[in-house]
Amino acid sequence: SFDKAVIYYDRLYENNPSDDNYNYLLKCFLALEDYKSAEKLAENQVKKHPSTMRYKVDVGTIYNKSGDESKAEKEYSKIIKSLDKASVSQILELGKAFSEIDENQLALEVYYKGRKQVGKAYPFNFQIAQILGQQGNIEGMITEYLDVLEISTGYIQSVQNTLNRVIGFDEESKYNAILKEQLMLRIQKNPESDIYSQMLIWALMQQNKYEAA
């Protein structure tokens, strides 16, 4: 039972405050609806590791689970505002932490803010595209994947591998049609660049493979 587990992990965390022991103890407190202890634990973890973003998200999650949604929203908002001097790894960590608690809109906010801050140093296209795809915004997802090729053609293999997984290349597939339409427009707008021509040839080859199967 969680009553026994919380005693065990409390001792374990006291002797060894590792990430795993913290996570197990926090889960026990939340399962027992002991929100005061959970909050104290998470806030203590934030003090010990102020640059680790996901512990700050834990504090907001505890407010949410205890029924104080407005306090949780304020906490999340405060975390996003604190990103002004964040590193790429902190932005990625925070975006992932929000996605893990199904706060995808907040994760998008984090990645868009990160993109403004670091520019082409790290564009966050793959993270944004994945969320847009989960939300059913396939057009937005494809746009993100194709945009990243303007930053570096070195991403082409990653883009192709990902699109291969998420797009059905049969002729009837609307996603396939959106991809080809976007590629044609980009070829017209950027005739001097051959990256989109390469992508279109690749897309047609995938369709041929699908039809031959």
For each predicted feature, which ranges?
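TPR/TPR-like (Sel1-like) alpha-helical repeat modules
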Residues: 47, 116, 133-157, 164-168
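TPR alpha-solenoid repeat register
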Residues: 21-22, 55, 89-90, 124, ...
